[in-house]
Amino acid sequence: MTGGRFDFDDGGTYCGGWEEGKAHGHGICTGPKGQGEYSGSWSHGFEVVGVYTWPSGNTYQGYWAQGKRHGLGVETKGKWMYRGEWSHGFKGRYGVRQSLCTPARYEGTWSNGLQDGYGVETYGDGGTYQGQWAGGMRHGYGVRQSVPYGMATVIRSPLRTSLASLRSEQSNGSVLHEAAAAAADSPAGTRGGFVLNFHADTELGKKKGGLFRRGSLLGSMKLRKSESKSSISSKRSSVRSDAAMSRISSSDANSTISFGDVDCDFCPVEDHVDATTTETYMGEWKNDKRNGFGISERSNGMKYEGEWANNKRHGYGCTVFPDGSKEEGKYKNNILVRGIRKQLIPIRNTKTREKVDRAIEGAQRAAAMARTKVEIANSRTAHARAKADAADQAALAARQECDIARAVARELSPDFYQPGPDYIKQRCQEGGDIKENPEEKVLEKPPSPKESPHFYRKGTTPPRSPESSPKQSHSPQPSSPEPSKKQNPSPGARLSQDKQSLAEEQVTAFVNKPSMSKAPAKELGASVSKYSGRHHVPNPSNGELHSQYHGYYVKLNTPQHPPEDREDDRGVSQSSSALVPRPSPNKWGPPKSVTKPVAKESKTEPKAKKSELAIPKNPASNDTCPSLEKEANSGPNSIMIVLVMLLNIGLAILFVHFLT
């Protein structure tokens, strides 16, 4: 056998022994452009046993066959390590994949590099799943056991909770980015394995008062559903939306917001959950989620038996609460949409009861099947651990062959650069820096906007994007004054017309009634002083008029207009003033006092004068007080009319809903 160094056209190099033109014995081979390195034993051009090192520092130590990893071996990839069997370059049949930083691990069977068959997955928080797998996901029958609730709420990292099952084919050995992001964004990322949730009955009992309280007549009417075979969403009553139903329905008083493993959108606060409470799910799984029949039970007595869909109670089932009360019927996304004991007239309770009973029986069968699958999974796990121990021995043999190959390469070509040790050293240094200064690394991750334009927030402009900064930062500013300039002239013109008409009205009123007492002037002065800090009012009469019309005081410059236009302007002011809210009643003293001299002159007809206050006068008249009082009296009447209409509509809807 001869040996030496051979440089390939792609930049790779082989340094070691060869026979008949093929690598044979011990040697080192680097990949294209010197990237990657295999060091170990060879047989007629193929690797046999040795160590392969990637530029990132990831390594494989074990056996090979036909240029692929085959047999027993250990792969270190990122923060994960796989120990076990390999088949034609993929993980399988038995093996253990574990995290180097947390207790997260999978022990069981593999196929094509993914969990497949039976296995046990232990999560970073200590929770476990035991059962069947397919394509790297929980699929079949299995049991999910959570940790105590207090621990599940403390551990927040998605890597530690690992609610989605572990994956094996990643570029850097970490959890899939989308799965990690989903777990981080979801509330389930902080409460691994808990899918049942209920609120305290005391607080919700206080909120549910009145006609729609729990168990009342109208509350039962509100919960009745159409027994159609079509979708529930198409038959939902128009009285409420989905969100309203989730807040008002009777199921919300005891339970029903649920945590999915990955796809929850909100995080309701649980009440009165002991820190030692645990939860167990036994049943069917599909595509890594609870689907089919199953039983979820807490150690505090809460239990659900029935159908599931996407980690939520969906279908027929029965929920038992810690206080012993039950909730039976049909669920849709964790909400009871068709209850048995909540209906006003239980006409079709028999059919619903049969469906609930069948669902409970199916859930119990699925739980029993899951327990049998757990036994098989535990036996597969024991075998996988034995293969992992054997893989450790294979890795030790591979390291020994690697050392021999390096010695042979140094003898044949002393100037040959071996990149493998540098790759490993660089990775160890990076890992040591992270362990020594974890706080500094955390502080360096969110860089300032100058360093990272990716953290651009609305309203800030990174310095590295000068082209986009004028458009984003300055474009909203000039656009805001333009609408105000366009809108100001039209209301201003109307305002000036109303001011002029009202001012002329008041002037004519004072001219026609010279015998006015001095008391209104004092009241006007008091009302003016109240708003003197905001507006300067030179004429108290004008200020009083505009406080009645606008609710604030405006300085007026009343020009002279032809007398024939006064009636038209007065009509416009009266019609427009009806649309404006009325001020407090104490400001209407002056108009009332104006009518006193008239009452003294005509003492023989006091009742007739009083009746005139409720009758609208001719627009040509100068006194506007009765029309203003009519406007004040019309406000409560319109409110009462609207309330009566709403009450009639509500009763009609309830009656129709009861009939359906």
UniProtKB/Swiss-Prot annotation:
Biased composition, class Low complexity, residue ranges: 466-477
Top-level taxon in the UniProt lineage: Eukaryota
Tissue specificity of this protein: Specifically expressed in skeletal muscle. Weakly expressed in embryos and neonates. Abundant in young adult muscles.
PTM sites of type Phosphoserine: 157, 216, 220, 452, 465, 469, 475
InterPro entries in alphabetical order: Junctophilin (IPR017191), MORN (IPR003409)
GO cellular component assignments: endoplasmic reticulum; endoplasmic reticulum membrane; junctional membrane complex; junctional sarcoplasmic reticulum membrane; nucleoplasm; plasma membrane; sarcoplasmic reticulum; Z disc
The keyword Cell membrane belongs to this UniProt entry's keyword annotation: yes
One Gene Ontology term from the biological process aspect of the record: muscle organ development
GO molecular function, one term: structural constituent of muscle
Bilayer topology term: Peripheral membrane protein; Single-pass type IV membrane protein
Ranges annotated as spanning the membrane: 639-659
Modification type Phosphothreonine: residues: 461
Keyword field contains Magnesium: no
Effect of deleting the gene: Mice are unable to suckle probably due to defective E-C coupling in jaw muscles, and die shortly after birth. In skeletal muscles, triad junctions are reduced in number. Mutant mice developed less contractile force and abnormal sensitivities to extracellular Ca(2+) were observed. Sarcoplasmic reticulum is often structurally abnormal.
Keywords per UniProt: Cell membrane, Endoplasmic reticulum, Membrane, Phosphoprotein, Repeat, Sarcoplasmic reticulum, Transmembrane, Transmembrane helix
Cytoplasmic side: 1-638
Protein's cellular compartments: Cell membrane; Endoplasmic reticulum membrane; Sarcoplasmic reticulum membrane
MORN repeats: 14-36, 38-59, 60-82, 106-128, 129-151, 281-303, 304-326
Primary residence: membrane
Similarity-based family: Belongs to the junctophilin family.
The protein's role, per its UniProt record: Junctophilins contribute to the formation of junctional membrane complexes (JMCs) which link the plasma membrane with the endoplasmic or sarcoplasmic reticulum in excitable cells. Provides a structural foundation for functional cross-talk between the cell surface and intracellular calcium release channels. JPH1 contributes to the construction of the skeletal muscle triad by linking the t-tubule (transverse-tubule) and SR (sarcoplasmic reticulum) membranes.
Domain writeup: The MORN (membrane occupation and recognition nexus) repeats contribute to the plasma membrane binding, possibly by interacting with phospholipids.
Protein name stated in the entry: Junctophilin-1
Species, as recorded: Mus musculus
